[in-house]
Amino acid sequence: MVREEITGSTQTLEWKCVESRVDSKRLYYGRFILSPLRKGQADTVGIALRRALLGEIEGTCITRAKFWNVPHEYSTIVGIEESIQEILLNLKEIVLRSNLYGVRDASICVKGPRYITAQDIILPPSVEIVDTTQPIANLREPVDFCIELQIKRDRGYHTELRKNSQDGSYPIDAVFMPVRNVNYSIFSCGNGNEKHEILFLEIWTNGSLTPKEALYEASRNLIDLFLPFIHTEEEGTSFEENKNRLTPPLLTFQKRFTNLKKNKKGIPLNCIFIDQLELPSRTYNCLKRANIHTLLDLLSKTEEDLMRINSFRMEDGKLIWDTLEKHLPIDLPKNKFSL
């Protein structure tokens, strides 16, 4: 049997957005194409991007609400139409946009009679509401209504077992998934030896980011996932050559800054925030995810601690070191973060 050899297209791989629309404040749609792809590649890329878009994109949600003088979540409050459980469900639906990391506090404090909407939430500066008209409760009488809220940025779907709260604090099941749905389809074209595939990708988001932004973030997450394999290849080493090799002890930032901390005690390291270092967004986000907010937080970490951070690379460590040398008015040691 003679097998016909089929080659892929030699054209440059390109992607573009062919349709973009805003159906509502909480529903954005985008349609993209990627081509030309060799046979089988479109399915590989489509599956990977769909999983990354649905499971790896971070979102911001209200995760906890604290009411005053409320015995349990099924209670009703005089003058308020909704029960506590209904209010919690309404808070769960609030769509937020932010670049915060860690837990932040928010609140609602109003006096009836009036309708309470998402616009009445008092938020930290780094958080904004996508749809301010989302309903929360209806105050039918002139009563005071105050809630303390917790806001968090994360990924995936988080549930917490509800218990009878003694202080009126109740968890809210959080859906940290700004991408609502993803579909992909494949179209084959070409004749003979020039057959190739076109990948069509449809993305729906909740308005906290656009489909294009979601596609970019998902792509970056996939790239970061495969970077360790690329670095191994660049090093040109094999398992056989390294299996008996002793790993040298990791250098620490503490050692490099020992003299700094001794001789520069007047520098308020806890007042220098990492966003002042003008780091690239990828490196900055890695540090923020690890709750590293100030220079003091950074210098308290060993190189081993930093390498445990998800998506943190050796290049990030060198970049941080070079940035400190460039921007901070201090005498730094000459030995740099080694690659």
Swiss-Prot record:
Enzyme class: transferase
Entries under Pfam families matching the protein: RNA_pol_A_bac (PF01000), RNA_pol_A_CTD (PF03118), RNA_pol_L (PF01193)
Catalytic function, reaction form: RNA(n) + a ribonucleoside 5'-triphosphate = RNA(n+1) + diphosphate
Region (Alpha C-terminal domain (alpha-CTD)): 266-339
GO molecular function, one term: DNA-directed RNA polymerase activity
Cellular compartments per GO CC: chloroplast; DNA-directed RNA polymerase complex; mitochondrion
Cellular localisation: Plastid, Chloroplast
Region (Alpha N-terminal domain (alpha-NTD)): 1-233
SMART domains: RPOLD
Subcellular location, principal: plastid
Function (record text): DNA-dependent RNA polymerase catalyzes the transcription of DNA into RNA using the four ribonucleoside triphosphates as substrates.
Homology family: Belongs to the RNA polymerase alpha chain family.
Subunit structure, as described in the record: In plastids the minimal PEP RNA polymerase catalytic core is composed of four subunits: alpha, beta, beta', and beta''. When a (nuclear-encoded) sigma factor is associated with the core the holoenzyme is formed, which can initiate transcription.
Protein's recorded name: DNA-directed RNA polymerase subunit alpha
Species whose genome carries this gene: Saccharum officinarum
